[in-house]
Design a protein with these regions (language model features):
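Electropositive polyanion-binding surfaces
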Residues: 1-273
Length: 273
């Protein structure tokens, strides 16, 4: 019990550093599905992260960063986890949304991670939390795997990798191979000869397979949500506008289910955006 108390104290200090450096902390949009004995989805809930999960995340990030620093300093051939700044057109769209919500845009053309993190904190636990957090997340570039340490924008870290996680990933195993050879005393020359081409291929393959897995997960999630909502066709729900396009509004319910309200369905109503 005392060990957990000490770990919690360390977690609080890490979380404070996390906030101070401008790392982003999004409120989760992840859904939790309720299945009956036949495997049919009968309900959808918003998944909530508990304190234990947040503690694990902070320690995991620290371990991943520490290993990435070691690899960069030793000039090892490596697989880094990188994340670039958002594209300008996405930043412009986010700015327009903030203005329409009555918020001051807290950044210039190229927002820093710290500025976006402050925006997330400013709207946390407010009526605008969901729409702002959702759209800041959509503004972000996709993280990927690379053999060069170009930094992680979202975590506001110069060095990052995927060394450990609650579920083992291929990039974890790839760098375990490299680190195993390194700690056994292999020379930098032999490591470069053995792994230089490997880290290039592993980075490309891991990024591609991650995207394929995310697409599959998104499709399955959509199917479960549609299955759960099918008995409720025709009912009214309260939702939050999570996106605006020329063809309509995206509306998200409290349980994370999102749907499109087409503009032609609003033609009889006075609506100003």
């Amino acid at each position: 019990e005392r060990d957990l108390e000490v770990l919690y104290e360390i977690y609080e200090k890490l979380a404070a550093l996390h906030t101070a450096r401008g790392a982003m902390d999004f409120e989760s949009e992840e859904a939790k599905f309720v299945l009956d004995e036949k495997g049919i989805c009968t309900g959808v809930k918003k998944r909530v992260r508990g304190v234990a999960e947040r503690m694990i995340e902070e320690f995991m990030v620290l371990a991943n960063e520490s290993v990435a620093v070691i690899a960069r300093r030793a000039q090892l051939p490596f697989v880094y986890r990188t994340h670039s700044a958002p594209q300008s057109k996405r930043v412009d769209a986010l700015s327009d949304l903030l203005i329409s919500c009555g918020l001051e845009v807290p950044f210039q053309e190229e927002p820093s991670a710290w500025e976006l993190a402050q925006l997330l904190e400013q709207t946390r636990h407010t009526s605008l939390e969901r729409v702002v957090h959702t759209n800041v997340l959509r503004t972000m570039a996709k993280a990927k795997y690379e053999p060069n340490p170009t930094g992680h924008y979202g975590l506001s870290l110069a060095d990052y990798t995927h060394f450990t996680s609650p579920i083992r990933r291929y990039p974890d195993l790839a760098i375990h191979r490299i680190l195993s050879a390194y700690v056994k005393g292999a020379s930098l020359e032999s490591l470069q000869r053995k792994f230089s081409a490997f880290v290039q291929e592993a980075s490309i393959q891991s990024s591609e397979r991650e995207q394929a897995a995310m697409n599959a997960e998104r499709d399955i999630s959509d199917c479960y949500k549609a299955e759960a909502m099918k008995p409720h066709v025709g009912e009214c729900f309260e939702g939050v506008v999570s996106g605006v396009t020329h063809y309509g509004l995206y509306v998200q319910l409290e349980n994370t289910v999102e749907g499109l309200l087409r503009s032609d369905a609003l033609s009889e109503h006075a609506l100003t955006l």
